[in-house]
């Protein structure tokens, strides 16, 4: 069709061209009662005091990027392996900011890093990398995240050359779900590519993670983004013109889908300049020999995602709900009945009025549990999440009960399902946004025998007890929630019945009793 596809394949496999150019979770002030306290995983990510070597030791180097390297590290006390992104401050290209004043330049550098930290803190989705800790010293920033041992999707593409439609659809559904979630929260990634998609392990495509939010930005519907950022193979033509919106991510996903199905990119070339010239024209082809066995539904989705005019291009949500993606969707089946029943049962029985206990159980569930411990519940969450936006709404929870009814499960035979779901949302929706978030689901649905080991309860207690006095104080709680102060009324509500010795503080034994009480009705 007039394209040298063989050269595209060879060039794509040997190059990773980089096109270079360069929550606030609390409320300060007059909180009247504990209902005003917003609880979410981002509140646990704070800049840690001390040297990173006191908490982690290096195992090996995983890779390197524009601003630093990524290390596999192991915690000295506790919960397995983590990936640590080490960002060397001096590696930033200070010239690209056209700033001569060193202080202003340093502020700009720090702004980019803090932007990535702020974004990662705010995200809670099964297909988006999770941030645990942040360290900083004179030379480096350290971002501690989940470790996914399966490596990059890029490596899988090189090894497998291309994927069948079922595997490609499974990969794209997860990527699009993550992108849909980002866009719903007014975040555009701007650097979606196979190198920024990680696999849980090399033998499974069921759990992937979107990483590297260094180029991400918040957007509004009224304002167009203007920075020229991204990677040449995957960059959208409107980004080259410096006038674009969140749909630049959809274009990048379209390029990835094209590559997954045929093994080479739609816009190839010997160098960045060649590639960008082709992207600017937006012309690509489905070579007959390479695409003759690919379904029309798959090709149609690619066409919609690679629509040149971004105003006419489909959204991530529309792509996620396309016929081709839905054709290969993994739905809840009979083998999932036990996990689904246990999850809904645990949510039904959860008593979430104690804010301190809510915060503790969310910390344990989101930060201390392992991938293996979360695996079955993560799978159920994604299957319940029919629209793929990374959150469970009332309709999706009701559908969970309806599925159990179809399996003749007694939990599905409840007469007042809508009332039950309303109560679940009231108790489990910790941040009161009207949805059950991924970490809320995991934390409340998981077996309390897994959650409430003495080690994990101690770690949760230490999160609050920042001065290591053995007591949780009013001031420490205010600090965790990002408040300037806590009223006596709110503190008394938080203390509740936990403060057995009436010393106006909570010790470890009182904390443990409180945690078991809030979940006494959970199935174990």
UniProtKB/Swiss-Prot annotation:
Residues 372-407, 416-451, 452-487, 488-521 form the EF-hand domain. The active site is at residue 191. GO terms for cellular component: cytoplasm; host cell plasma membrane; membrane; motile cilium; nucleus; plasma membrane; protein-containing complex; symbiont-containing vacuolar space. Its main location: membrane. Gene3D superfamilies: EF-hand, Phosphorylase Kinase, domain 1, Transferase(Phosphotransferase) domain 1. The modification Phosphoserine is found at residues 17, 28, 34, 64, 118, 217, 220, 335. Changing residue 155 to A: No effect on catalytic activity. Activated by calcium. Upon calcium binding to the EF-hand domains, the C-terminus of the junction domain (J domain) undergoes a conformational change which results in the dissociation of the pseudo-substrate inhibitory motif from the catalytic domain. This, in turn may facilitate the autophosphorylation of the activation loop at Thr-231, which leads to the kinase activation. May be negatively regulated by PKA-mediated phosphorylation. Inhibited by purfalcamine. A motif (Basic cluster involved in membrane binding) lies at residues 10-20. It catalyses: L-seryl-[protein] + ATP = O-phospho-L-seryl-[protein] + ADP + H(+); L-threonyl-[protein] + ATP = O-phospho-L-threonyl-[protein] + ADP + H(+). Keywords: ATP-binding, Calcium, Cell membrane, Cell projection, Cilium, Cytoplasm, Flagellum, Host cell membrane, Host membrane, Kinase, Lipoprotein, Magnesium, Membrane, Metal-binding, Myristate, Nucleotide-binding, Palmitate, Phosphoprotein, Repeat, Serine/threonine-protein kinase, Transferase. Its cofactor is Mg(2+). This is Calcium-dependent protein kinase 1. The gene is CDPK1.
């Amino acid at each position: 069709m007039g394209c040298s596809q063989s050269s595209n394949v060879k060039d794509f496999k040997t190059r990773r061209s980089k096109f270079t150019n360069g929550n606030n979770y609390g409320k300060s002030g007059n909180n009247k009662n504990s209902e005003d306290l917003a609880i979410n995983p981002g509140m646990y990510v704070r800049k840690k005091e001390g040297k990173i070597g006191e908490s982690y030791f290096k195992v090996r180097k995983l890779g390197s990027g524009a601003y630093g390297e990524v290390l596999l590290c192991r915690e000295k006390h506790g919960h397995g392996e983590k990936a640590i992104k080490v960002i060397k401050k001096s590696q930033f290209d200070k010239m690209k900011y056209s700033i001569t004043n060193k202080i202003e330049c340093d502020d700009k550098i720090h702004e980019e890093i803090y932007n990535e930290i702020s974004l990662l803190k705010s995200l809670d989705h099964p297909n988006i990398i999770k941030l645990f800790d942040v360290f900083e010293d004179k030379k480096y920033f350290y971002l501690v995240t989940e470790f996914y041992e399966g490596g990059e999707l890029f490596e899988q593409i090189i090894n497998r050359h291309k994927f069948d439609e079922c595997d490609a659809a499974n990969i794209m559904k997860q990527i699009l779900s993550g992108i849909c979630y980002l866009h719903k929260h007014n975040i555009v990634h701007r650097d979606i590519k196979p190198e920024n998609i990680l696999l849980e392990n090399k033998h499974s495509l069921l759990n992937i993670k979107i990483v590297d939010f260094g180029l991400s930005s918040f957007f509004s519907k009224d304002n167009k983004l203007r920075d020229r950022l991204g990677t040449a193979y995957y960059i959208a033509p409107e980004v080259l013109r410096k006038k674009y919106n969140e749909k630049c991510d959809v274009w990048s996903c379209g390029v990835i889908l094209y590559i997954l199905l045929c093994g080479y990119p739609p816009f190839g070339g010997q160098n960045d300049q060649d590639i960008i010239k082709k992207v600017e024209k937006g012309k690509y082809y489905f070579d007959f020999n390479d695409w003759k066995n690919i379904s029309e539904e798959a090709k149609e989705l690619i066409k919609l995602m690679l629509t040149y005019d971004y105003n006419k291009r489909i959204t991530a949500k529309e792509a996620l709900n396309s016929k081709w993606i839905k054709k290969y969707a993994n739905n809840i089946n009979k083998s999932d009945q036990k996990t689904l029943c246990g999850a809904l049962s645990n949510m039904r029985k959860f008593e979430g009025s104690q804010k301190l206990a809510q915060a503790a159980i969310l910390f344990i569930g989101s930060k201390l549990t392992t991938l293996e411990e979360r695996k079955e519940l993560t799978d159920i969450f994604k299957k319940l999440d029919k629209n793929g936006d990374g959150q469970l709404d009332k309709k999706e929870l009701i559908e969970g009960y309806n599925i159990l009814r179809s399996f003749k499960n007694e939990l599905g035979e409840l007469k007042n399902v809508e009332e039950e779901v309303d109560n679940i949302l009231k108790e489990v929706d910790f941040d009161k946004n009207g949805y059950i978030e991924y970490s809320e689901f995991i934390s409340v649905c998981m077996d309390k025998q897994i959650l409430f080991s003495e080690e994990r309860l101690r770690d949760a207690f230490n999160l609050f007890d920042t001065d290591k006095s053995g007591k949780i104080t009013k001031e420490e709680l205010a600090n965790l929630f990002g408040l300037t102060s806590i009223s006596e009324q709110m503190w008394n509500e938080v203390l509740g019945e936990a403060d057995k010795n009436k010393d106006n503080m909570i010790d470890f034994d009182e904390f443990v009793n409180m945690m078991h009480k809030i979940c006494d009705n959970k199935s174990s």
